Amino acid sequence: MAKQEQAPDRANDVFALTSFLYGGNADYIEELYAKYEDDPNSVDPQWRDFFAKLGDNADDVKKNAEGPSWTRKNWPIAANGELVSALDGNWAEVEKHVTDKLKGKAAKGEAKGAAGTPLTAEEITQAARDSVRAIMMIRAYRMRGHLHANLDPLGLAEKPNDYNELEPENYGFTPADYNRKIFIDNVLGLEYATVPEMLDILKRTYCGAIGVEFMHISDPAEKAWIQERIEGPDKKVAFTPEGKKAILSKLIEAEGFEQFIDVKYKGTKRFGLDGGESLIPALEQIVKRGGQMGLKEVVLGMAHRGRLNVLSQVMGKPHRAIFHEFKGGSYTPDDVEGSGDVKYHLGASSDREFDGNKVHLSLTANPSHLEIVNPVVMGKARAKQDLLVGRTRDDMVPLSERAKVLPLLLHGDAAFAGQGVVAECLGLSGLKGHRVAGTLHFIINNQIGFTTNPAFSRSSPYPSDVAKMIEAPIFHVNGDDPEAVVFAAKVATEFRMTFHKPVVIDMFCYRRFGHNEGDEPSFTQPLMYKAIRAHKTTVQLYGEKLIAEGLVTQDDIDRMKADWRQKLEGEFEAGQSYKPNKADWLDGAWAGLRTADNADEQRRGKTAVPVKTLKEIGKKLVEVPKDFHVHRTIQRFLDNRAKMMETGEGIDWATAESLAFGSLAVEAHPIRLSGQDVERGTFSQRHTVLYDQENQNRYIPLNNLQKGQAIYEAINSMLSEEAVLGYEYGYSLSDPRALVLWEAQFGDFANGAQVVFDQFISSGERKWLRMSGLVCLLPHGFEGQGPEHSSARLERYLQLCAEDNMQVANVTTPANYFHILRRQMKRDFRKPLIMMTPKSLLRHKRAISTLAELSGESSFHRLLWDDAQYNKDEGIKLQKDAKIRRVVLCSGKVYYDLYEEREKRGIDDVYLLRVEQLYPFPAKALINELSRFRHAEMVWCQEEPKNMGAWSFIDPYLEWVLAHIDAKHQRVRYAGRPAAASPATGLMSKHLAQLAAFLEDALG
């Protein structure tokens, strides 16, 4: 009976392996059929007979072979490289490959049958079938093994139902086949292997304490490298006795530090690493292995969890300094002003040396807003890479050079899955203007987000799944197996240093206490915390393992713990009288700069440039190579600019900007301009990058001014505000010599990056003593384009202004724009600059300047006079100061609306005074100017609604000024749009009616 049942199965197996009616061959058969319909003699006689019997309609056959009209002719692209593709499942190809190899071996006498005789055709078929099935099983482990890995230290995670997808029986192997050697063509580092030998390697590699996800990677070289690195009989996680003792020592330091603070400062927030101590030896391994592979610097960013441990055990911050902060002391010397921040937000830097390789480490200060430090770290790393290479032209920096600086980001599991800025940063990782040769992401996966379980905080199996979108390899690892964690860190570092791509380590661990030390986690996670209380610490578990291996004794471990505690006691005593001796914020690249003071209230800097130099730069700005085909509209643009440079008149906004950039570049200041569509400019005004109309080659005049100049980079960024602005802020922290600018497509969209403005740009210097010279260009102006294309929300930035933290300007002339940009680099301190930039003024006939206004003794003016006061050829001549009836103060584009309306009405007793810089507020200068008009009525006019714009900010300042000059009118009158919920109307008729109304109010 059994034999009868077996026979049909055997026949089916042979048929399955030999039949041409296999799904993978469908395309081939259809093409053959179409060929037959064209010319029956063009196919083999056997096929001819076969097709003749089908009797299908010839047109249908041809149509079928062509496929649908929308298909791409070159699609799908044939897989290359690896024996088995991760995606195509083309087993017929594999079978053919294996069969050919087996036939070759049989012919050479290398492959023999059971009786020791050469393989028969049937035995070759059987052997090929075994090989294909074995490779299918191996592929299943590579793809799905991580789901069966032993990752959760608490053992609470539910085992997935795998439908026996990894069982040998699923691939046709019975226990009777287990002793048979199967040809696997060195797939696991073995030419032949039995099923148990394969399972031993596969389970150890993919289902142990490490689970690897890499089959989503499409680059065959990267996949093959990972397989080669972890698969094979000799690829076990193995450490020398010294290595194991070093891991134990680091774990004891990490655990001992947390326990010591818990005793000394009971209940104080420290966001301890308890439960995730394996992080510390893993970070050491990253620095050590990276150093061996050429790493020079690591820029770290991390949240609060375990930060103090990283600062002290990895960064080498003195324990006494941390204990000093715990008792409420400041982290800065007494003579340094600042508002300070909590201890688990502070940064630090140090040098570590392993095996003679010195690596500089810097931990970036950050707010509590999770993951927002990520782009800042990437930007800092990019600037450090540029400084290391010393870029002078638009050459591409090789990724092997960029790889010398590593951005290393530590994440929480819930935040990595939840915060959108994570995906934005992953999106930046491969872009030319933002790539950093791969960020190493380390997720401290304590399987909870404050009080929220993973099932409620993400829709994917792992927190790391978002990283699959950029094909990053992901190493999941059990935090209670320190050797596995250190091994994963080592392989991840090697991958990054080899391929210069991002990589993720997802360390499953737990949080021994609550979210902070004053929290009771059992309210919401009773079962998890019951398991945690019964669970031994990582140090206990690893100590027991090493004792069992005979490497250490319990006495050795107790002695190591006691020695460490004694060291901490000494540091604790020293911390009671500890005084920080110097602030490090003006070291390194920042040497030579100082903190700003009010000794020079105008703070102009020397921003003028000789006319001769400006003309030389201008000449280069309009030159293109002979064989370069410029678009005819761009050629007109260049011709107009050439005329401006020749006459020295009519300098428009974009030309003034290019002259500012060019003059800084020849003075050795690199320019980095980033944002959406900045090469051309949202309003087609900039055109600093030209494209050949025939081959799309680029030419950048600003990089061809003179030999030895600094580089100009215009980077069309991805469609993101938050990550890109954070990145540029980070860049500005590392390179104070560079003018770093971020431009919003419209200022209205800048609030997509509000966290960066609030947490870093406006407050970073006061909180963390970190200066930045970042410039934010925010197109702003009411022109009837509706509520999302009118307002950069000037009021938001003014509300953030205090303690001389940043500058806010709304300038109206190209000359003033030229000077304010150069001023950023021409003073010995750095402050962020928030600029409301124009839209309609870019081509306004009045918004022009002369070369004379950019040279000589000229400089930036915080206030600008009425053009009618000093331009002789204006339409009206103003009355003398004493006869001026009203002074209308304003800022930005509305000045030109007021000017034209006044001219139209022939009014000569209303003076228009522009406030070009709103903060720091030019109070003294305003006292001088308004003293001329003590008896005049004072009006503040703005185009924004009353609850927006500068009104609420400037009103108290203006009252203070009027009191000081003893003005007749002590209150300023408001003229502008009424308060509104939405910034602007979308109806042009309503826009014009509102404009007419407030112009009447201001001038009537």
UniProtKB/Swiss-Prot annotation:
It is an enzyme of class 1 (oxidoreductase). Its cofactor is thiamine diphosphate. Its EC number is 1.2.4.2. One of its GO terms (biological process) is glycolytic process. Keywords: Glycolysis, Oxidoreductase, Thiamine pyrophosphate. Homodimer. Part of the 2-oxoglutarate dehydrogenase (OGDH) complex composed of E1 (2-oxoglutarate dehydrogenase), E2 (dihydrolipoamide succinyltransferase) and E3 (dihydrolipoamide dehydrogenase); the complex contains multiple copies of the three enzymatic components (E1, E2 and E3). This is 2-oxoglutarate dehydrogenase E1 component.
